[in-house]
Amino acid sequence: MSTYVWQYLNEYREERADILDAVETVFESGQLILGTSVRSFEEEFAAYHGLPYCTGVDNGTNALVLGLRALGIGPGDEVVTVSNTAAPTVVAIDAVGATPVFVDVHEENYLMDTGRLRSVIGPRTRCLLPVHLYGQSVDMTPVLELAAEHDLKVLEDCAQAHGARRHGRLVGTQGHAAAFSFYPTKVLGAYGDGGAVVTPDAEVDRRLRRLRYYGMGERYYVVDTPGHNSRLDEVQAEILRRKLRRLDAYVEGRRAVARRYEEGLGDLDGLVLPTIAEGNDHVYYVYVVRHPERDRILEALTAYDIHLNISYPWPVHTMSGFAHLGYGPGDLPVTERLAGEIFSLPMYPSLRPDAQEKVIDAVREVVGSL
């Protein structure tokens, strides 16, 4: 049987009754758009984070777009983020007319190197956008200190780190707003697309709710500020309500898979396993490892019917769609080096032990033969 980085069927078979009941609940409610399930999920997701406000949207990319717009970010502004991220992080900045500015990442944990932030803040900088990557939290203390010093907004990208903590603080609870994705692969994933923005600020939440609904305010069909059609689907919201109750269990399942990888692969020369940043409680959205012979390893593993991913093979600043930003080879040396060495092993809480052992045995054989 083929082995892939992620699949949902094991989880669905375990939770099928609850998932189908969620669908039935929505269909029987008579509310298909912005109904009880969306409102309840928003309340429960906000409460999970200890925050007063949550706005459900249609996907994680638009969570970032609406988050930026609600914080007043637009044309002429610069937003500082990383290039070692999923492209949608940067696409969202471009979508609001702002300019992405990149900072390099840490060699050890691949997170934003906050020690370099000051060097890229300029007169047009208006927002810092840290990405909590692969399941770990960025060190928010220097981010918040610089934001306060320079009067900048902070939008956290939490798409890959639901439930992650650093020094006890949940991701998404320290910035002016935080964007989440519920793409099916996520730690908290829907059975389709979904996203949300959480915030402690009532005015930001008011703007978000208008922006997700064409820009309409109190009067239906009257647009105050042109917005988007970006509503969280009612069925997905009800599924997410059920899954939110199991989020901590999903995280523990991922950590168990990670522990087995550490036991089975920790002694292999040249293979670098994830390093947990100081104070972090890793939730292992993906299990990213490094090896200088990455491409040879991936090719060899296909003979074992094991098909792995790279997160991410092309840094965003090297993509043709962002050539106008003027970055060149060597501008972000750590990011560029990592892109040639990292790859992801299968990681999801319903990964069967026999499937994981197959991966461990194959990786040991391939890496050991190099």
Curated annotation (Swiss-Prot):
GO terms of biological process kind: antibiotic biosynthetic process; phosphorelay signal transduction system; polysaccharide biosynthetic process
Pfam families listed in its UniProt record: DegT_DnrJ_EryC1
GO terms for cellular component: plasma membrane
Modified residues (N6-(pyridoxal phosphate)lysine): 186
Presence of the UniProt keyword RNA-binding in the record: no
Gene3D superfamilies (UniProt xref): Aspartate Aminotransferase, domain 1 (3.90.1150.10), Type I PLP-dependent aspartate aminotransferase-like (Major domain) (3.40.640.10)
Classification via InterPro entries: DegT/StrS_aminotransferase, PyrdxlP-dep_Trfase, PyrdxlP-dep_Trfase_major, PyrdxlP-dep_Trfase_small
Keywords assigned: Antibiotic biosynthesis, Cell membrane, DNA-binding, Membrane, Pyridoxal phosphate, Transcription, Transcription regulation, Two-component regulatory system
GO terms, molecular function: DNA binding; pyridoxal phosphate binding; transaminase activity
UniProt region (Hydrophobic), positions on chain: 53-158
Chain residues forming the annotated DNA-binding region: 160-179
Known function: May form, with DnrI, a two-component regulatory system for daunorubicin biosynthesis genes. This protein probably acts as a sensor protein.
The protein, known as: Daunorubicin biosynthesis sensory transduction protein DnrJ
Organism: Streptomyces peucetius
Annotated gene: dnrJ
